[in-house]
Amino acid sequence: MQDSFLKKVISVKKNNIETRLTEARKELAGVEGFPDPEFVGIIKELGFRCELCARCCTKEFNDHVFLLDADLVVIRQINPDSVTPAPYPEFCDQKGRFYVSGYALKTKPDGSCIFLENKRCKIYDRRPSICRVYPYMLHREADDSGRVGWRQISGLNEHGSYYSGLDDSECEEIARVTRAYEEAYLRQMIGFFEAVKIHFQKNGLKHVQSVYDRRIREFLKGKCELEVFVYYNGEFEKCDLKPHAD
């Protein structure tokens, strides 16, 4: 998790709870309204086929595996020690406590997924939702030029094969499960933002970016633990993260 903190900077503006809540609701409405025939057509045109390279199961290629609440139930049944608070906590209050929208799978020292062995998933039949839909997606993000638009696939031309001639029923199923994942993810994010808003209002708290930055620097230098509240099933679970031992 320590390295992950170095990879992403969250601006003060984006950490306004109301702003992020509004954006998440708009994104959900956009996903729900995206034309199904268009999405199916894009999937069919791409014709992606997995070639079992396992690159998507590494931190270098895919950063982390975020878990929906339903995923966490399954993963904890398999191995409760295989999860950790997701990287990039969204908020930090004035007392230095962090708040993050969910859990992620742990990784091995080499950066590969904790469940990856010999380029194969040990829990394939029970793998998390994002692993089932990857590399497909349905959300808006900026391209290299900064232009924001809809994206339907990750890592284009970086793995797998393309133009494989998928049949219509397969494309429709891919579209269905991908849309379902994106909607579930956004609903979890909306629930998280609403829960943080209520918690902050009730307890006289607020997000303070300078405290966020200072605590992260101290953590990366091994000077402190982090108190992280992880959103799960409508509530927060407290986790204490210890700094990496050199």
Across the structure, where does each feature detected by a protein language model lie?
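Short loop/turn segments that flank or connect secondary-structure elements
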Residues: 1-246
